[in-house]
């Protein structure tokens, strides 16, 4: 896949989509154009998660380049949203797939994974991590593996 790197952290774009379904990184300067569509979509992902983050916090972190926004498309129609985060740990940089939602998310994430992996590697990441519900382990398949379980209870 031919990549064009834009000045923004996650703005890798495929030169020509190989299928009707494709993924692209959204440059921060274009965030305001996409947010009316992707913001409500992310709300659904937040509701299915632990509620530890609000939509406006994601928006602010995207504007501050702490998170990266990716959209899955069919043609020009936005089908889904993925948020990534780069973390620096003692063992190196890790690219975390954090919030994913939309129609047929598994299909477009798998389609766009090579692009996201190329971006993460170019940014110096040596590991990719997905944080989500247990069903993602089956969707991602090999070479992904479940490393630990996070348990939680209300007080």
Name each model-derived stretch:
Residues 2-53:
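Short amphipathic alpha-helix that is part of the acyltransferase structural core
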Residues 90-141:
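Acyl-donor binding region in acyl/amide transferases
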């Amino acid at each position: 896949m031919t990549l064009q790197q834009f000045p923004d952290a996650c703005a890798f774009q495929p030169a020509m989509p190989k299928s009707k379904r494709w993924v692209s990184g959204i440059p921060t300067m274009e965030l305001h154009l996409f947010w009316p569509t992707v913001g409500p979509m992310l709300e659904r992902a937040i509701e299915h998660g632990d509620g530890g983050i609000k939509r406006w916090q994601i928006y602010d972190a995207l504007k501050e380049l702490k998170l990266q926004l990716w959209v899955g498309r069919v043609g020009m129609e936005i089908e889904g949203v993925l948020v990534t985060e780069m973390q620096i740990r003692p063992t190196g940089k890790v690219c975390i797939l954090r919030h994913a939602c939309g129609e047929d998310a598994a299909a477009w994430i798998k389609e766009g994974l090579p692009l996201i992996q190329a971006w993460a590697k170019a940014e110096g990441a040596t590991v990719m991590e997905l944080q989500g519900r247990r069903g993602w382990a089956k969707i991602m398949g090999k070479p992904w593996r479940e490393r630990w379980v996070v348990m939680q209870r209300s007080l």
